[in-house]
Amino acid sequence: LTVRSIKRQVDGALGAHGAWLLEPYEDMQDSTGLVLETIEDIEGTAEVAVKHGFQVNTHAIGDRANREILDLYERVWEEQAVDGEPLRWRIEHAQHIDPLDVPRFGELGVIAAMQGVHATSDGPWIPRRLGEARTEATSYPWRDLIETGAIIGNGTDVPVEPIDAIASYYSSVSRMMNNGEKFYPEQSMTREEALASYTVNNAYAAFEEEVKGTLTPGKYADFVVLSQNLLTVEEAEIPNTDVEMTFVAGELKYSRDDSVAAGDLKRLASVADHDH
């Protein structure tokens, strides 16, 4: 068990008009959202965290919330005279970001801890909250974040979404919504970027890149064998991917095929040979 992070929450969710926005909601003109924990309170936590070398992970969904937390992180680091990048502070969700703030993630070394599946689940109704122009400019700008040097971590935000890494990976590369339309696909990740967001980037965000995140000698060898290659299969077939086997510390812990004995690597080797 490792305890090295502190979670705070500055705003609510966009669907409930709780995300803190720079401008009023398109469908609720008298509101810019909610502030659930004050900037002053979160800043106090951040100051203590710096002194003890802790990571701070702050929930921020709206563009105002993201700007305020970026400002807060930068301000605390300057006041404490520390280099913030090694602290690996994160913004959880980072869903709607003003274009002026996008490059600040990479510049400051703030990790965007996002959930790919949120974009496609929320996509059909986001324009009702933000309007088309603001949605296109601010919502889930993964391509812009990556191209300005940000590290993106990925997940599902369970229980808000099912704990299905394949579904979130598919959303990350396709931006395909359940209505059959794509949500501003120009902001999609490449397949390699999406895979990194779920592996090496998440390991980095958890200070575990020396033991997790890649299949490298000396690491834990925690990995899964999938029914098809996520990097080459037709995009529409990605959701049909099954987990064939799960290995923990190099040992077989789960197999969809009951005939595979624990520790039997022959099938794994044949899959690897086929893919190469």
Predicted regions, residues:
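Metal-coordinating catalytic core of metallo-dependent amide/deamination hydrolases
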Residues: 1-67, 79, 104-111, 116-117, ...
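Short conserved micro-motifs at the rims of enzyme active sites and ligand-binding pockets
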Residues: 14-16, 103, 235-237, 257-259
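His/Asp/Glu-enriched, well-ordered alpha-helical/loop segment
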Residues: 46-57, 64-89, 93-94, 99-103, ...
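Extracellular/periplasmic ectodomains of large secreted or surface enzymes and adhesion receptors
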Residues: 256-276
